[in-house]
């Protein structure tokens, strides 16, 4: 949620008004903050120093490449003043959720730009992701052991850069492939 939720993109703690009561915040750099790799943990100096000394994942991990760190810093600067982008992103996500639900897809409820489309069967999720790619729509299928058995899904991940025309094209592809695979009527 860092970069998307909360004032200035400050994430879930800010969104729910509990930022002052959270000891540690961890987040990814793989979504709003540059779309690359890696992540971060932030908190009081004493806690971070303890983690630096005692956390095996930290001790045995390589540092982020400087270019990734620079991209994340630039992304943070952009999202701090990007409330208009977040508003547009949430509007686009709401519109897309509405369109997919109207087609008959089962969605995990929420008000965020990551939209899980529940399919249940792992082979259907894989096949649908492959077919959507053939239609020019890149999505990721998830199945066991990433999610519980019987809860396979496709995950859509929106960006503030997606246009309405692109989303309309995605909806059309979902309709075509969903009907072809008998996921929707």
What are these regions (language model features)?
Residues 1, 45, 65, 144-146:
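Short, ordered loop/turn segments at secondary-structure junctions
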Residues 42, 116-120, 157-159:
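Short hydrophobic/aromatic beta-strand micro-patches
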Residues 55-64:
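A short glycine-threonine-serine/GTX helix/turn-capping micro-motif
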């Amino acid at each position: 949620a860092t970069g998307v939720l909360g004032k200035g993109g400050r994430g879930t703690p800010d969104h729910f008004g509990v930022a002052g009561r959270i000891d540690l915040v961890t987040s990814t750099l793989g979504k709003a903050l540059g779309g690359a790799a890696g992540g971060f943990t932030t908190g009081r100096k004493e806690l971070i120093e303890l983690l630096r000394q005692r956390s095996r994942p930290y001790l045995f991990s390589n540092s982020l490449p400087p270019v990734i760190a620079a991209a994340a810093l630039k992304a943070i600067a952009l999202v701090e003043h990007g409330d208009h982008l977040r508003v547009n992103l949430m509007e686009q996500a709401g519109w897309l959720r509405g369109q997919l639900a109207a087609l008959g897809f089962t969605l995990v409820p929420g008000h965020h730009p990551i939209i899980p489309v529940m399919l249940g069967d792992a082979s259907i999720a894989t096949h649908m992701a492959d077919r959507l790619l053939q239609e020019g729509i890149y999505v990721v299928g998830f199945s066991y052991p990433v999610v519980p058995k019987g809860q396979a899904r496709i995950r859509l991940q929106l960006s503030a850069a997606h246009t309405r025309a692109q989303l309309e094209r995605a909806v059309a592809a979902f309709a075509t492939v969903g009907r072809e695979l008998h996921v929707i009527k």
